[in-house]
């Protein structure tokens, strides 16, 4: 493993383990004799398992019912691959599951097939512990070595960068339940360059899950993936319940088979859950709060809402304050000023913000509220790695030019308090809401955001990042909030974490504020340092001298 690139450090050399003892410690039920899983004179694999085993497509996806034994069949295929010499297509295989128990169950199946296929390997199982310097935690991996071929099968954690620098086939198990599936697939697909395959196996986890989106892309002809669909009824027709009866030493009968199948459906929490778990029908709501259809219906068909991006160059912080100010001022006048000048004075305007200093994005979303109370995104500003002062500069440039500005809501969590306070000092608490993002806040305001979509009362920019960010809103313990996953920005250069979704929700919250309307006379009545047009004012700069040491 390329540990330097992956920020993983081996804590000890690989050591051989007793598979039964390890399984006992983790409470995993394993089979160590192929005769326990295969009746005499019957094929090892059931029909759907055999079809999956034999599929040589470079990218294969299986949407399946629970506990149909597809990973077991995949283990047999992987042993064949790793045991062959390179000249016959042999290579390493890397398995990515979401839990240690899954990894051990898979490795146990690989060991079973390695022994069953005779002299292909000694089938010893090894473990090795690595220290993840990013997550500050230990990661345990299991491995089977094949001395004749020189290849191995290794079970890794689901951290995407673990695949960087590796070469071999990749198996992603229960893919729909990985937090960073998009990053994981990106890392896995890179291995295709040298002929390796990617095998993706999962039960569904909602219609808006990336796993389902990949399946739809394949079925609609946009991707060249091979897709297998294995419902519980498909598996039963191919002999699953008969095989279960053999392994568990129960008598089989058609009546018992029907009762078993009907009991699974009857005892599911509800019909939608049963259809998803056993029928390969993803829930319409899934974990996502806003459906893809609902989001796309709110997107402007004319593509006339611009998304403006400013990413500070690498040497930005080494420039003088005057140079940074000049660069940003030029950008504001070239990019923002024409859009601000074009805003209608007949509409009220509010703004929502999501803050980040490094890594994620700061997003400003101005909303126009028309006389008939419809809301429309005016434009969007996305800032990456921009200094605090220049974020303030851009913010005040916008706020001071919004016609009939009535309020703004800011993410004041952590360092976000800086921008929120800067705006509040100028416009006052009646106009600026400084918000600490909590489950209680999400529970109150996310439903109002959803209501705007359901009432078709909001128009937003038509862009892939719009969709990606809004799909990050997931229901967790009954509360709609931003999930832990991340997506790549346009061009794949930076991370996103639902930044636009938070900013848009903030803007909707600002639309409920009752601040007075800021007009030209009001602006001129403010003291000079409160107008937002004199960012070099000494008094205001002195106020923020704490910035360098405080953040």
Swiss-Prot record:
Signal peptide feature range: none
Nuclease among keywords: yes
Cofactor: Mg(2+)
Enzyme class: hydrolase
Biological process annotations from GO: provirus excision
Subunit (UniProt): Interacts with the terminase small subunit gp28.
Protein name (record): Probable terminase, large subunit gp28
Organism: Escherichia phage Mu
């Amino acid at each position: 493993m390329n540990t330097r690139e992956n920020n993983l450090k081996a804590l000890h050399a690989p050591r051989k383990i007793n598979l039964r003892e390890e399984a006992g410690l983790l409470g995993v039920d394993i089979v160590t004799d192929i005769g326990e899983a295969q009746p005499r004179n019957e094929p090892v694999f059931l029909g759907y398992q055999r079809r999956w085993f034999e599929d040589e497509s470079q990218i294969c996806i299986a949407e399946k019912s629970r506990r149909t034994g597809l990973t077991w069949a995949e283990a047999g295929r992987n042993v064949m691959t790793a045991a062959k010499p390179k000249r016959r297509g042999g290579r390493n295989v890397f398995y990515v599951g979401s839990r240690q128990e899954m990894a051990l169950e898979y490795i146990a199946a690989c060991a079973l097939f390695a022994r069953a296929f005779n002299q292909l390997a000694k089938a010893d199982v090894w473990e090795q512990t690595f220290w993840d310097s990013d997550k500050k935690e230990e990661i345990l991996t299991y491995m089977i070595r094949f001395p004749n071929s020189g290849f191995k099968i290794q079970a890794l954690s689901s951290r995407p960068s673990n695949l960087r620098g590796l070469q071999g086939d990749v198996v992603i198990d229960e893919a729909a339940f990985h937090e960073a599936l998009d990053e994981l697939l990106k890392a896995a697909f890179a291995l295709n360059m040298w002929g390796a395959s990617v095998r993706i196996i999962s039960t569904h986890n909602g219609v808006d899950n990336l796993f389902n989106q990949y399946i739809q892309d394949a079925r609609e002809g946009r991707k060249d993936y091979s897709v297998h669909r294995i419902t519980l009824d498909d598996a039963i027709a191919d002999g699953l319940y008969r095989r279960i009866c053999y392994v568990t030493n129960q008598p089989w009968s058609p009546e018992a088979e029907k009762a078993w199948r009907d009991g699974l459906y009857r005892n599911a929490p509800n019909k939608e859950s049963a259809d998803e778990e056993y029928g390969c029908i993803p829930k319409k709501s899934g974990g996502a709060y806003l459906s893809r259809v609902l989001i796309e219906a709110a997107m402007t068909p004319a593509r006339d809402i611009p998304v403006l991006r400013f990413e500070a160059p690498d040497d930005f912080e080494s420039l003088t304050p005057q140079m940074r100010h000049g660069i940003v001022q030029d950008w504001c006048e070239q990019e923002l000023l024409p859009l601000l000048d074009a805003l209608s004075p007949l509409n009220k305007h509010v703004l929502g913000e999501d803050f980040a200093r490094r890594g994620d994005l700061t997003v400003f979303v101005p909303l126009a509220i028309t006389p008939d109370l419809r809301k429309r995104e005016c434009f969007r500003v996305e800032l990456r790695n921009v200094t605090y002062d220049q974020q303030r500069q851009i913010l005040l440039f916008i706020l001071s030019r919004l016609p009939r500005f009535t309020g703004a809501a800011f993410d004041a969590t952590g360092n976000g308090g800086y921008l929120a306070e800067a705006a509040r000092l100028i416009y006052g608490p009646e106009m600026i809401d400084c918000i600490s993002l909590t489950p209680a806040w999400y529970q109150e305001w996310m439903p109002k955001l959803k209501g705007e979509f359901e009432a078709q009362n909001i128009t937003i920019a038509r862009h892939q990042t719009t969709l990606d960010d809004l799909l990050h809103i997931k229901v967790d313990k009954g509360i709609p909030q931003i999930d832990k996953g991340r997506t790549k920005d346009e061009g794949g250069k930076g991370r996103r974490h639902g930044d636009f979704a938070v900013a848009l929700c903030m803007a909707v919250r600002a639309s409920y504020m009752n601040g007075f309307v800021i007009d030209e006379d009001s602006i001129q009545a403010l003291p000079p340092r409160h107008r937002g047009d004199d960012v070099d004012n000494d008094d205001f700069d002195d106020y923020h001298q704490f910035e360098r040491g405080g953040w």
